[in-house]
Regions:
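Aromatic "clamp/platform" in nucleotide-sugar-dependent glycosyltransferases that forms part
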Residues: 247, 266
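Short hydrophobic beta-strand element within catalytic cores of glycosyltransferases
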Residues: 283-287
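Membrane-proximal helix-turn-helix segments that form the acceptor-binding/catalytic region
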Residues: 70, 125-145
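A short, well-ordered alpha-helix in the C-terminal region of glycosyltransferases
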Residues: 314, 321, 328-342, 350-354
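Short His-centered aromatic/hydrophobic patch
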Residues: 83-88, 105-108
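A conserved mid-protein helix/loop that constitutes part of the nucleotide-sugar donor-binding site
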Residues: 15-23, 184, 188-210, 224-230
């Protein structure tokens, strides 16, 4: 059986990348011998459950990472090793263990523009964003295969690297009962960080609340900006209207209890939450940020795409259009469910099976 190792910072975090890799591995372990290699996770348990046949190795973070990972790969002789973009990305390809090396990039091609936001001088910020981007391209060029999450990003990457493919993330949930889109509540899910744009969403809902004061907004997630966002909600007098709920263990139930899904991100790789919301029959209003929403949301079909990112009034108007028209919400919700079938796990998994088998035989 072909042996595959996924190298990831840790599996203790309840985030999108960890969820995606866990779901993928749990499906593919029927066809491949799979190991997750983490670093410094220690006694923290994996957040998402893994099938028993999947192996786990945690490298002590007190030893040099290169040495620990090299020893692990040479001892286990994997056929394929996968970097998910952690520190190992910069040296994994140098380890001579005879495995095929894959680099998966789960962010937008232009994410460096967001990551460099702390540089106040716009010219310096642009320069350093370009430096980081081309540094990433340089290291990625040493891998046997590069995988990105959207067709949009694939077109950008292939200008520099020929061995790049795009494979969508699959739906990671099963929803047996979809939303009826009648509850006066909208939902947003994600890490409470700058790139997710929840500061925008609070401004959007301030406008919505002026016309529809009986509607609520629930935000599910945790992160560094929680106190800052909570303060903004308080400042606008929306403490009883916008609720930051934290992390939930049953996100499907929450989707079912809401009527509209909202996404205010500045940048995304491939937003898993939009697939999840679609699978539960929710209409979507999202900023058309780089690079995933436009490949999930059919504008006017299962929701609305709003441009440019940060256009508060335009997004608020689209939300209010859905709030005012229940039949439109339900029609778009049904279309969401139809479109979500593209991202069923078994369909996406077949692409991974084909890729892994091709790499091993080449």
């Amino acid at each position: 059986m072909v042996k595959i190792a996924y190298i990831i910072n840790g599996l203790w975090n309840p985030a999108g990348m960890e969820r995606v890799f866990t779901v993928r591995a749990n499906f593919l372990c029927k066809y491949f011998d799979i190991t997750f290699i983490t670093r410094g996770q220690g006694h923290r348990p994996d957040y998402f459950p893994l099938e028993k046949r999947i192996h786990r190795i945690d490298i002590d973070d007190k030893i040099p990472y290169f040495n620990g990972l090299e020893k692990c790969l040479l001892e286990n002789q994997y056929d394929i090793t996968v970097s998910t973009g952690g520190e190992d990305f910069f040296f994994l390809y140098k380890i001579k263990d005879n495995s095929k090396k894959i680099f998966e990039f789960h962010f937008s091609y232009d994410i460096s523009n967001v990551w460099m936001r702390s540089i106040m001088n716009p010219i310096k910020r642009k320069i350093w964003a370009e430096v980081q981007k081309f540094r990433r391209i340089y290291f990625a060029s040493h891998y046997d295969q590069v995988i990105v999450l959207t067709k949009t990003d694939w077109k950008k990457w292939r200008k520099w690297i020929s061995k790049v493919l795009y494979i969508y993330n699959p739906s990671t949930i099963i929803c047996h009962e979809t939303s009826i889109c009648e509850v006066k509540s909208a939902i947003a899910v994600g890490r409470l960080s700058y790139e997710k744009g929840f500061d925008y969403l609070i401004d959007v809902w301030e406008r919505v609340h002026q016309k529809f004061p009986d509607w609520q907004l629930d935000i599910f997630g945790e992160g560094a900006l929680r106190s800052e966002l909570q303060a903004k909600i308080q400042e606008k007098g929306l403490a009883n209207i916008i609720n930051i709920k934290g992390v939930t263990n049953d996100i499907v139930k929450e989707y079912q209890k809401h009527s509209i899904y909202l996404m205010s991100s500045r940048s995304e790789g491939f937003p898993l939450v939009l697939i999840e919301a679609s699978s539960c029959g929710l209409p979507i209003v999202s900023f058309d940020c780089p690079s995933g929403p436009s490949e999930i949301v059919e504008h006017g079909g299962n929701g609305f795409l709003v441009s440019p990112v940060g256009n508060i009034d335009a997004m608020a108007n689209r939300v209010m259009q859905l709030i005012a028209d229940k039949s439109l919400r339900q029609k778009m919700g049904r279309r969401s469910l139809e479109l979500s079938q593209r991202f069923k796990l078994e369909n996406i998994a077949s692409e991974w099976i084909e890729l892994y088998n091709q790499l091993v035989s080449s």
